[in-house]
A protein has these predicted regions:
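Phosphate/dinucleotide-binding and metal-coordinating scaffold of catalytic cores
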Residues: 1-174
């Protein structure tokens, strides 16, 4: 977010909490959003509908080379915390196409991209997928999960439980 503000020529010391909330707008995790949202020109245009393979290549470019060309896009989809790069994406029912914005018949998913900076490297996704399957076998209720098998990596994805079409669902997790 700070990089986007700098790119717009705004000094960070002058950015208010309201400016930051307007930037997040309707793209926040969970059930809360903020209105009015920043203009489309400021926050960027919607991703073209692309395949997960291309998105994964872009994520690797960001986290290994800090490529500015794709940083802006991935910054908008990666609003969740944690040590691994993630994307909050919407996928077609067959999971072949994705977009950062809701589309009719697309569902919300969180995808965890691979990194080379951890012990497991490209096997992180496989491990998390196995953990999810074990949790389901143990009777723990989880949203749908998927393992994307790409040419050079396997990515874990979990369907969002706080979205239904364009509706946000409030969930209190203890």
């Amino acid at each position: 977010m700070d990089k986007e503000f700098r790119k717009q020529g705004r000094a960070l010391r002058e950015i208010s909490y309201i400016d930051r909330l307007r930037y997040v707008g309707n793209n926040a995790m969970g059930s809360l959003s903020f209105s009015p949202q920043e203009s489309e020109e400021f926050i960027g245009k919607s991703l073209e509908i692309i395949g997960i393979e291309k998105l994964n290549q872009n994520a690797l470019a960001i986290f290994e080379e800090d490529s500015h060309d794709v940083l802006e896009t991935l910054n908008r989809i990666a609003s969740s915390g944690g040590s691994r790069p993630k994307g909050n994406l919407y996928f077609s029912k067959d999971l072949r196409l994705c977009n950062e914005s809701w589309q009719p018949s697309f569902d919300g998913w969180i995808v965890k991209f691979k990194t080379h900076s951890t012990v497991l490297a490209s096997e992180e996704g496989v491990c998390e997928y196995i953990y999810a399957k074990l949790a389901k076998q143990a009777g723990i209720t989880l949203p749908d999960t998927h393992l994307f098998e790409l040419s050079d990596s396997r990515l874990f994805a979990i369907q969002r439980f706080d979205r239904e079409d364009q509706r946000r669902i409030f969930v209190d997790v203890l």
